[in-house]
């Protein structure tokens, strides 16, 4: 059984962000990431950064592994406004999907169904400001793109990502 990931003891602090050095290697340590693939990885990295609220402070993309320095800020104490949520959703979802969510939120607010509006927010915000969710989504999306592009199946990464607390 896997040991739980060690997260910063202050990860639930309302003010202090956590910094992590994250590393992941390609399966069999094969040298498969060329310049265009690394550019696509950067694209997925920025998409996930814009959605999640996590900040990529630095990165190094190699042919068979990568290093990320991530800042995981605390979730805003008052949550996200509807506009902030929709802005983040635009980073990763299609315009028609975001328009549907915007319509749902508008209807819920008009009818004073705050519980329903909170449920809509919760469908997405549980994946924000979270190290594991950030890395899971980044690695999954890049793997799906890579596998589709190279007509392959299966895992692309050697094992689960490693993370070290920096601060």
State the predicted function of each range:
Residues 1-167:
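Short catalytic/metal-binding and nucleic-acid-binding patches
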